[in-house]
């Protein structure tokens, strides 16, 4: 082989080597870019997941706020209703006292007394419609949670610890005792 051919061979080999190096370089760059793309995709996926978690937490917080607000509103509403009922009870007492006195004075047939009786019945039926339970009935067993004893009497017809008579009715609204019934019970 002559020099010229050797030179051409070297040049071709150099060109091939350069091409190989360029291919390797491009291949390395491609691998590097793929790694970078995968890292970016991973970050995007993590960010989306985190955003989704934040949204879910935010929605849960909103639900909790709604529930707590509803509970508070219900509690305030019940407290106001209880307060209203407590304001009505003295009026009921006054009407019952008038009817008791009218019975003693034998005035039950008077139109004004009959009007008072109807008013009292109307008030009591309204309370019942709104969920107020009226406590204290004759021949009912005494319960210290809902009854106050104002007197004890001996009785041949009523068993011990049973109510002989009710002096003032008791009122309960949703497990809240607005007023205990004032009762007379039989002695033990």
From Swiss-Prot:
Gene3D superfamilies: 3.90.20.20, Head domain of nucleotide exchange factor GrpE (2.30.22.10). Its main location: cytoplasm. The keyword Manganese does not apply. One of its GO terms (cellular component) is cytoplasm. It comes from the Bacteria. Keywords: Chaperone, Cytoplasm, Stress response. The keyword Nuclease does not apply. InterPro entries: GrpE (IPR000740), GrpE_coiled_coil (IPR013805), GrpE_head (IPR009012). PROSITE patterns: GRPE. GO terms for biological process: protein folding. Residues 1-29 have a biased composition (Basic and acidic residues). One of its GO terms (molecular function) is unfolded protein binding. Residues 1-33 are annotated as: Disordered. It is found in: Cytoplasm. It holds the Pfam family GrpE. Participates actively in the response to hyperosmotic and heat shock by preventing the aggregation of stress-denatured proteins, in association with DnaK and GrpE. It is the nucleotide exchange factor for DnaK and may function as a thermosensor. Unfolded proteins bind initially to DnaJ; upon interaction with the DnaJ-bound protein, DnaK hydrolyzes its bound ATP, resulting in the formation of a stable complex. GrpE releases ADP from DnaK; ATP binding to DnaK triggers the release of the substrate protein, thus completing the reaction cycle. Homodimer. Belongs to the GrpE family. This is Protein GrpE 2. It comes from Buchnera aphidicola subsp. Schizaphis graminum (strain Sg). The gene is grpE2.
């Amino acid at each position: 082989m002559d020099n010229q051919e050797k030179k051409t061979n070297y040049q071709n080999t150099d060109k091939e080597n350069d091409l190989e190096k360029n291919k390797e370089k491009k291949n390395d760059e491609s691998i590097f870019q793929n790694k970078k793309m995968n890292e970016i995709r991973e970050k995007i996926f993590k960010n989306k997941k985190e955003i989704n978690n934040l949204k879910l937490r935010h929605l849960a917080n909103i639900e909790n706020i709604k529930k707590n607000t509803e509970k508070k509103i219900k509690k305030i509403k019940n407290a106001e209703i209880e307060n209203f009922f407590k304001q009505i009870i003295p009026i009921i007492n006054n009407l019952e006292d008038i009817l008791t006195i009218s019975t003693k004075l034998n005035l039950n047939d008077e139109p004004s007394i009959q009007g008072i009786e109807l008013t009292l019945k109307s008030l009591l039926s309204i309370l019942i419609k709104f969920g107020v339970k009226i406590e204290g009935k004759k021949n009912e067993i005494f319960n210290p949670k809902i009854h106050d004893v104002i007197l004890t009497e001996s009785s041949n017809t009523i068993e011990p610890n049973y109510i002989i008579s009710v002096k003032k009715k008791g009122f309960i609204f949703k497990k809240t005792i607005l007023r205990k019934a004032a009762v007379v019970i039989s002695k033990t």
